[in-house]
Each structure stands twice: as structure tokens, then as C-alpha cells.
Amino acid sequence: MPKYFCDYCDTYLTHDSPSVRKTHCNGRKHKENVRVYYQKWMEEQAQQLIDQTTAAFQAGKIPNNPFPNAAGQVGNEPGAKVLPPAILQAAAFQAGKIASNPFPTSQAGPGPQGGGTMIPPPPSLQGPGGPGSAPAPPRMPGPLLMTPPPGAAAPGMAPPGAPTLPQPARGPILSVGAVMGPRLCKHSYHINKALFLIKIHTLQKATQSQLVVYKTVEKSK
């Protein structure tokens, strides 16, 4: 009778039956061997990524200064001044008021065709400034607002030419074929569990590799 060989435990089972396989796969030693196998494989992949990044930096493909200043922009010129946030917010508020009502209130148009005149509403229903109504009180002058110079950024936005923060490095896109490696996983339970562990481990290694690159950049300055 053929026996079942477990690739993760490197051993043969006594019988090749579904019940024996299920019992073996639910065992503590088998689960530990599966976790150790995929953890070791992910460490090798992360080390290869670190080696490739270091080699690219030494070859000059990665610049020494990861935050270069964009030339020809107002925000990066020496001696350029940035307006305080309060002035920028006041200017944006004033611009919003002008844009909300770009056209002044027009007078009433001609009456309907035929020469008839429209009967005005009684004074109680007329708005301020209408015929027969009391004059509207004078408006209080608003605060003096300063408009931002050309090239200034709106409130809540970075000024032109400001350096952007580096995005965290993303790990490789994992597929079932890539995760399995040289062996084939025979149970969907192990696939789901291994993928969960691999995602966490990949994020940790990617962050560590990014720190190694930045430390190397700082040492080379």
C-alpha cells in the first residue's frame, strides 16, 4: 500500500488515506514545520531584496540626496518668503466670497409685452432699498485682507517646490505560485495561514531594508 510523504515534515505517514492526512495536518509539529518553512523562505527573499537595493546604490542608480530641490520654482529660491497661514486663509476666504457672487444684482427688466406695467409689491414685502422702504443701514467695512502673491499655495497645501515625503517601500506582489516556492502546498488551510504570515513578515523586512538604505546614504555624506 503506498504511503503518503509530507514535504514539510520530511517523513512518510503510515497510510495514504484522507483521515490520516487530516490528522497529521492538524498536528502541532506539522503546523510548526509549515510556519518555519515559509518564514525561512521569506527571509531569503527579503535578503535578496536588500542585496539588490544595496548593489543599485553602490552602482550609482540611487542618488545620494533622496530629496533634491526642484529648480526654477518659487518655493525653493534662496531668500524666498512664505506668508503666514493666517494671511493665506484670509485671502482664500475673500476669494471665495467674490467667486460666490461674481455678478452684481441687476435691475428689474421691462414689463411683459403689450406695454403693460408690473404692479410693485407692497412696502412690507419689498426688500431693503426698494421704493417706499426705509433706507438700508450703512455696511460696516470688512477687515483689510491681503491677497497672496503669485505662486503662493492655498491653505492646507504645501508651497510649490516643497520636497515630498518618501513613500514606504512596498513588498513584492505575492501570488499563490510565488508563495509556494519549489514545493506545492496540498491544503488550502496552510495557504491562507502562510499568506497571512508572509504579508506581515514582508512589511517588516521592507521597512528594515529602507532603513538600511537611508543609513548608508547618511554615512556617505
Curated annotation (Swiss-Prot):
InterPro entries: Matrin/U1-C_Znf_C2H2, Matrin/U1-like-C_Znf_C2H2, U1-CZ_Znf_C2H2, U1_snRNP-C, Znf_C2H2_sf. Residues 134-166 have a biased composition (Pro residues). GO terms for molecular function: mRNA binding; pre-mRNA 5'-splice site binding; U1 snRNA binding; zinc ion binding. Its main location: nucleus. It comes from the Eukaryota. It is found in: Nucleus. One of its GO terms (biological process) is spliceosomal snRNP assembly. PANTHER family: U1 SMALL NUCLEAR RIBONUCLEOPROTEIN C. U1 snRNP is composed of the 7 core Sm proteins B/B', D1, D2, D3, E, F and G that assemble in a heptameric protein ring on the Sm site of the small nuclear RNA to form the core snRNP, and at least 3 U1 snRNP-specific proteins U1-70K, U1-A and U1-C. U1-C interacts with U1 snRNA and the 5' splice-site region of the pre-mRNA. This is U1 small nuclear ribonucleoprotein C. It comes from Branchiostoma floridae (Florida lancelet). The lineage of its organism: Eukaryota, Metazoa, Chordata, Cephalochordata, Leptocardii.
